[in-house]
Amino acid sequence: MSWLSSSQGVVLTAYHPSGKDQTVGNSHAKAGEEATSSRRYGQYTMNQESTTIKVMEKPPFDRSISQDSLDELSMEDYWIELENIKKSSENSQEDQEVVVVKEPDEGELEEEWLKEAGLSNLFGESAGDPQESIVFLSTLTRTQAAAVQKRVETVSQTLRKKNKQYQIPDVRDIFAQQRESKETAPGGTESQSLRTNENKYQGRDDEASNLVGEEKLIPPEETPAPETDINLEVSFAEQALNQKESSKEKIQKSKGDDATLPSFRLPKDKTGTTRIGDLAPQDMKKVCHLALIELTALYDVLGIELKQQKAVKIKTKDSGLFCVPLTALLEQDQRKVPGMRIPLIFQKLISRIEERGLETEGLLRIPGAAIRIKNLCQELEAKFYEGTFNWESVKQHDAASLLKLFIRELPQPLLSVEYLKAFQAVQNLPTKKQQLQALNLLVILLPDANRDTLKALLEFLQRVIDNKEKNKMTVMNVAMVMAPNLFMCHALGLKSSEQREFVMAAGTANTMHLLIKYQKLLWTIPKFIVNQVRKQNTENHKKDKRAMKKLLKKMAYDREKYEKQDKSTNDADVPQGVIRVQAPHLSKVSMAIQLTEELKASDVLARFLSQESGVAQTLKKGEVFLYEIGGNIGERCLDDDTYMKDLYQLNPNAEWVIKSKPL
């Protein structure tokens, strides 16, 4: 029995359009027994070209049939794509060096985690002055603090075993001070506000969960997509813990159909939504530290193991197109196009696919001819940067195969070696909301080059799906085809059992589906993390101010007189309830604006742009932005719907500047 025939009757429960429900576990077990060794696939990096394969008597690519039949065949898409990848690797003449993942020693994993979380000065030679870390720790939630404490204790025990003479402060003492200060707050306001903010979303979440649970009783075409807001004001791990403690959480089986996935949305925040790219580098660094701690805390609360991996450095190409690290590729691209954030070859391949139209049936699914793909690769390597490559000779399916090949042949995965296991573990989280929250944090943690390229890929995939009526590529089909290109490479040279491979197929396809469907939400920085950054900055300012006062006192400087003069100057310059907006690059460089309840950032921009003349008049909305600078934030680009009075109350010491975004 061939693998194609054996898999024909296997359907992922998550994608089954009918009311006949089977458990995922039983499906996996059955598939594991029936699968043959041809499904095995272990190598991560290899020179691969897509190739045609022998198909069933009823060609899987002839899909001008009902939508239900398309969904039932989606699992077949996964195995066909996997077979294409395997055959292309067998046909390739060159073998790229496999990325080796280092197995960490005892305590090494936790030590590396603390470094990544910005807490390296809690141990080692710098442990003598942990003040910066103490400020950082004082801003953490209880679940975040527990995650840090757990890992510090492991490192501490390991170092004692190795007789290392490092002084490691007991973070329980630090957190005891933190808890004491919170407990003495009048009325326990922090705990109450946390639960209040969470409870206002809880009813909506439960309602959405009920809709998901009842979906099987209603035909898919009549099922309304449940809508629920994502709570970005409260720590995700805190939400999970509170739901766990109150036993209100309804654990739902993963479902992949668009008809059953909740239609998550971001509630409007009067102080503005913060997206990746809106913050200054120094604040974004703090965001990444907090995102790692929050992700770990979420996995800890839900009992999911989170292990970071580290790739051993291997020799890679530093020029060319394929098998080149993203950073090296961007460096050579930026010499041609300054400010380039996405590889030129990646953009050109997407552009070539779209030039021929996205309505082509089987787009992304049907592979290009293996020999032709191999020849195109060699020709691209030789002529792309010279500008002499003939793009007219590239067929649409060939361009799609080259795009997938580019992703597979990256020396390290697009989802990064460090976090690919965490991406895979997303499938183990109990609810879709928690899976979405984890993916949000993981996207934040990706290196800039990986994150930007992933964003371009997901946006392209969505455009393909938008033409599903003609190209027969639903979100499930696209997820099934793309999942092995992003995830199966993560075996990193290790073989896996057939049953494990099937489980991974189901899980990674579901995760790919979530990445595509919720991509607009995933590039948002949660408000609770931004608030923690603000708190850290405030505490650091206080510390710096105390140090400055001591310095001024030693210098016998007339501090009081200076402060009075400075205060009187500021008070006279900006009346109460008015902000002064600076626009150094516009013809009107400054304007005093009265704050009102309804004044938005877009209104401020409109006032400036309406008064422009000459060359500056050509500026359009979207070319310049209003920034919040200083106070309790480094720098933040404001979205149009930010209510200025609310933000002013949150950060009264900020300056307001209109400028363009840096490249």
From Swiss-Prot:
Residues 15-37, 179-227, 243-277 are annotated as: Disordered. It is found in: Cytoplasm. CDD domains: RhoGAP_ARHGAP18. Residues 324-523 form the Rho-GAP domain. One of its GO terms (molecular function) is GTPase activator activity. One of its GO terms (cellular component) is cytoplasmic microtubule. The record marks R365 as: Arginine finger. The modification Phosphoserine is found at S66, S69, S263, S610. Pfam families: RhoGAP, Ubiquitin_RHG40_C. Transmembrane segments: none annotated. GO terms for biological process: regulation of actin cytoskeleton organization; regulation of actin filament polymerization; regulation of cell motility; regulation of cell shape; regulation of small GTPase mediated signal transduction; small GTPase-mediated signal transduction. The modification Phosphothreonine is found at T158. Keywords: Cytoplasm, GTPase activation, Phosphoprotein. Residues 197-219, 245-258 have a biased composition (Basic and acidic residues). Rho GTPase activating protein that suppresses F-actin polymerization by inhibiting Rho. Rho GTPase activating proteins act by converting Rho-type GTPases to an inactive GDP-bound state. Plays a key role in tissue tension and 3D tissue shape by regulating cortical actomyosin network formation. Acts downstream of YAP1 and inhibits actin polymerization, which in turn reduces nuclear localization of YAP1. Regulates cell shape, spreading, and migration. Interacts with MPHOSPH6. This is Rho GTPase-activating protein 18.
